[in-house]
Amino acid sequence: MTRNKFIPNKFSIISFSVLLFAISSSQAIEVNAMNEHYTESDIKRNHKTEKNKTEKEKFKDSINNLVKTEFTNETLDKIQQTQDLLKKIPKDVLEIYSELGGEIYFTDIDLVEHKELQDLSEEEKNSMNSRGEKVPFASRFVFEKKRETPKLIINIKDYAINSEQSKEVYYEIGKGISLDIISKDKSLDPEFLNLIKSLSDDSDSSDLLFSQKFKEKLELNNKSIDINFIKENLTEFQHAFSLAFSYYFAPDHRTVLELYAPDMFEYMNKLEKGGFEKISESLKKEGVEKDRIDVLKGEKALKASGLVPEHADAFKKIARELNTYILFRPVNKLATNLIKSGVATKGLNVHGKSSDWGPVAGYIPFDQDLSKKHGQQLAVEKGNLENKKSITEHEGEIGKIPLKLDHLRIEELKENGIILKGKKEIDNGKKYYLLESNNQVYEFRISDENNEVQYKTKEGKITVLGEKFNWRNIEVMAKNVEGVLKPLTADYDLFALAPSLTEIKKQIPQKEWDKVVNTPNSLEKQKGVTNLLIKYGIERKPDSTKGTLSNWQKQMLDRLNEAVKYTGYTGGDVVNHGTEQDNEEFPEKDNEIFIINPEGEFILTKNWEMTGRFIEKNITGKDYLYYFNRSYNKIAPGNKAYIEWTDPITKAKINTIPTSAEFIKNLSSIRRSSNVGVYKDSGDKDEFAKKESVKKIAGYLSDYYNSANHIFSQEKKRKISIFRGIQAYNEIENVLKSKQIAPEYKNYFQYLKERITNQVQLLLTHQKSNIEFKLLYKQLNFTENETDNFEVFQKIIDEK
């Protein structure tokens, strides 16, 4: 069996003559003249050579992006014959196909069994071939699946000896690109439209390119082609284009098109000489527009963020200095001026929710029925318990105080339509002003004497907890700042911090770094760098007051808080805990994220998808350290939220392979439910830690998901992850083959093996490697030492 390898050749082969100078004593040629002539020729030759290299590289890139090979027993000759079909069409056609999101499969699997064709409808299976015939699907050797993105499946054959079959392949390729050229969403090319009209007047041309059904429709419509006729007969227009495409590019059929449909031949000739390139460029431009990230920038972004402008200006200096992206969750805009005035912000020791209505808006009411959870019995009960718990457990640090509103705050709430200042009333000789809101349960008033706000239940109304009461002070949660209890409002929640890798490297002691980088063994060096980045950049530890953070994240929080205090803020800290990246218990999904980039620019994304795309384009796609919340794409253990997040690199759900901790947790869960260990007759409670295979798998999974791999170059930075994934796969294979494994675990390990296969294949594809995962696995020898095996692995990947 030949080695399963797809080797792209040149798109076109240009013959070059090398000038040979035969200089003899009888030739009267000046040396300088000869040198001048040689230099000019050499420049031209080198220019052509470079151009040829560029064409070859472009063709190779087009192939790598498009073609997937699937075969087990075909010869390299047949693969080459199949590949040669693509060499006969311009690279721009392949680029059009690529821009449409298309894929091409070379396979020796029968089309009826191919995975990409299992969801075809009967109508799709009976689509026309190039002769306008509906043939049995089982007899197809090439098929174009038309959905949102085209997929072309081609059986590996010796197409060089069968011109009809090669023409059929070109017809199906033509169908793929016709999805864009002739689309219901686009205006038909006027030149092509006029061409169809002229072809309908020529019997030879129409007989060659139109189906009988289409010719009859044209006759019934008096050969009048308007927008409605095009929409009703889109498939027929696409068929005519695809058929002309096949005649033009199938070498043995080109003269037929030139003889019987010369106008169409000329049209195809124009496309080949520049038309396809224009279409490709147009699609690329559309792709840029489609991928454009819709954001607010500058002052608009800042205003929409809710951050105090002076604080944001202080933060951007830090972002510049530390070459770090600082991402914030949106701040309650009713809290912005409170923070600016010196109101304290809540940390992790207060779990009550803030309010977004009535006079308490922006604060955290002790009575949670005044919060944004108003009217929700369970949430109010839980919030009230949380507030009481905070005061009890953090006595002296957390308390409650009466709510006071000054004139400026009342005016701000009035401007936002939250309250209205109503009529004056006298109660026990004291003057109050009613504060009107849209609430149906409570009435509010403010004391003219001390600005304290009170509330009571309206006549005939009861609270969600079944209470009814007269005027009482509204109390809000407060924090002790330098001996004074200050009311609390929402803090600045960090969504993420993404420092440059050079900043993380500064955290590593120079002696430790030098010891690792001077290691001669490349794999050991990469492992060493990875371990240093884990230790100093990624390793995070729980903190009782700030949540889960790494050392550099703690330093960043200190820098941010000091910068705010320098602006004159007197409320203590404004950033009180770690990022949303580590909020795995109670994750939250925000439509808007405020970003300060390392250039000090303000940016606000407008939806969750745009946030992901921004991170992909500007952070994970460059040399910045970033990791995702591991609770995404699963039910969070705390608030039971399900938040979907797609990995910008692999385009896959990020939890497709478990982490080391999740792997052990899954095994423990099976053990608890079955009361059986991984291995038969195992009564050892600590077997997970002692069994070598389980330890190895856990270690490989830990290395696989290590964000520190981003320290390496773009070309190599995913290689370690791929290699670790393959190592985990191999160890799982060993476990499954073992006769000692308990049957209760077999399904889990099989499932895990499939997950690894799928995700590693995605990484291979992103690496632009043409090799299939299982084929790569077979070429590695796991009985060799790890370093030698890794070198073999790198060589295979680089060749592909």
Curated annotation (Swiss-Prot):
Please give the residue ranges the record annotates as the region Interaction with calmodulin: 623-800
What this protein needs as a cofactor is:
Ca(2+)
Stated consequence of mutating Y171A: Loss of cytotoxicity due to inability to bind PA
Q: In which organism is this protein found?
A: Bacillus anthracis
Q: Name one Pfam family in it.
A: ATLF
Quaternary structure and partners: Interacts (via ATLF domain) with the cleaved form of protective antigen (PA-63) anthrax toxin; interaction is required for EF translocation into the host cytoplasm.
- Tell me the domain of life: Bacteria
Q: Where is the active site?
A: H351
Single GO molecular function: calcium- and calmodulin-responsive adenylate cyclase activity
Residues annotated as binding 3',5'-cyclic AMP are T548, H577, G578, T579
The family database entries (SUPFAM superfamilies) matched by this protein are listed as: Adenylylcyclase toxin (the edema factor), Metalloproteases ('zincins'), catalytic domain
InterPro entries linked to this entry: Anthrax_toxin_C-terminal, Anthrax_toxin_edema_cen, Anthrax_toxin_edema_cen_sf, Anthrax_toxin_lethal/edema, Anthrax_toxin_lethal/edema_N/C, ATLF-like_dom, EF_HD, MetalloPept_cat_dom_sf
Q: Where does the protein end up? A: Secreted; Host cytoplasm, Host cytosol
The entry's protein name is: Calmodulin-sensitive adenylate cyclase
Lineage of the organism: Bacteria, Bacillati, Bacillota, Bacilli, Bacillales
User: Could you tell me which residues belong to the region Catalytic CA1?
Assistant: 294-349
Residue stretches spanning the membrane: none
Name the coiled-coil region(s). none
- Region Catalytic CB: list its residue ranges: 350-489
Give the gene name.
Answer: cya
Where along this sequence does the record place binding of Mg(2+)? Answer: D491, D493, H577
Question: What happens upon changing K525A?
Answer: Great decrease in calmodulin binding
Query: In what way is its activity controlled?
Result: Host calmodulin is an absolute requirement for its activation. Inhibited by ethyl 5-aminopyrazolo[1,5-a]quinazoline-3-carboxylate.
Where in this chain does the record put each ATLF-like domain?
Answer: 60-273
Signal peptide extent: 1-33
Could you give one GO CC term from the UniProt record? host cell cytosol
Q: Which reaction does it catalyse?
A: ATP = 3',5'-cyclic AMP + diphosphate
